[in-house]
Amino acid sequence: MPRSLKKGPFIDLHLLTKVEKAVESGNKKPIKTWSRRSMIIPTMIGLTIAVHNGRQHVPVFVTEEMIGHKLGEFAPTRTYRGHVADKKAKK
């Protein structure tokens, strides 16, 4: 269920301060974060945010189409390796 419009988007305060500092200084280094629940806001456009997926930080370059989505949507946590084939069926 989407968040109420009167509440506004959620973004962790520590991530917001890092984003504002990066925009202010023009720094293009990836911003490391564990906050997968934070929403992408327009000030993040053009920045690379390294989102933690439980094992490592996945670099996510923010574009205009990503606004309104959560950071965790772009850093998958599970790897799908396909179903194991039955050995009897091969013979």
Swiss-Prot record:
One GO term describing the cellular component: cytoplasm
Any GO MF annotation of the entry: rRNA binding
Gene Ontology BP annotations: ribosomal small subunit assembly; translation
Keyword field contains Ribonucleoprotein: yes
Pfam families: Ribosomal_S19
Matching InterPro entries: Ribosomal_uS19 (IPR002222), Ribosomal_uS19_bac-type (IPR005732), Ribosomal_uS19_CS (IPR020934), Ribosomal_uS19_SF (IPR023575)
Regions that span the bilayer: none
Protein purpose: Protein S19 forms a complex with S13 that binds strongly to the 16S ribosomal RNA.
Protein name per UniProt: Small ribosomal subunit protein uS19
